[in-house]
Amino acid sequence: SESTFAADMVPETLRRSNLGLLVEGDRVNLERPVKAAGRLGGHIVQGHVDGTGTVDAIAPDGDASLVRFTAPPAIMRYVVEKGFVAVDGASLTVVNCDSDAFTVTIIPYTRHNTVFGSRKVGDLVNLEVDIVAKYVERLVSPHDPGPGAIVSRRR
């Protein structure tokens, strides 16, 4: 029906996400994927959860809300000011960040049409960092690309 969705979850998903904590009736964000010929209005969100974070603070900011999330170093290394991060599947712009936390603005539309309207301090959220950042790190890291690599590193 229009209000239900079923999916299988593999152990990797349960290890990296908060989905194992959900109970029947809990709300989740579910969006249709963008078509290749469609408009990309945010960043590429694959739906692969990289890890979890915690809602640390929520403060009003005009009609919007500033929401601060704490996250582990493995996530924070890819979070930059004015960059993108997916929180519970929603592509959001980072307002600011430091070594262990980042803040986003939740506009009224997002608050009313996603799970953010019911989020509170202490809630565990799913985080997905920008895939481009992970690829760039991999490409510029000082490792041996191995035989058959398209690009070799000059020494």
What are these regions (language model features)?
Residues 1-155:
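Conserved loop->alpha-helix
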